[in-house]
């Protein structure tokens, strides 16, 4: 795991590609006109609270959205990118491997309409997916 995931620095939040074998867990955003990318497929994660480290932010967001306790050992890749909402700041993107059993244990929270598994290659090419997240997953696939 990259050391910066346990350090405090200025970042806006964390998004996570949660892989279950060759598929990625996706969430359909709420269809509300007052949020960015309404009714669009995205990945778990969100904004930093207080002085969280990237790992703390990731673990809190995944717990809130999916009811999963994400162990740091599940992180297989990470990279810092420009924030999707503020290009002058940084955001963290991580790729994690979770088991079928963990996937079955998901308790979907109150953010988003639904979740499902999508083949990674389909996610990269699909319409209706946040483009920056497609690029980040593509980076992982090309560099692994």
Please place each PLM-identified region on the residue numbering:
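Short, charged, solvent-exposed linker or helix-capping segments at domain edges/interfaces
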Residues: 103-109, 126-130
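Active-site-adjacent beta-strand/loop module that shapes the phosphate/pyrophosphate-binding cleft
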Residues: 20-22, 79-104, 116, 120-122, ...
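Acidic, metal-coordinating catalytic segment for phosphate/diphosphate chemistry
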Residues: 1-15
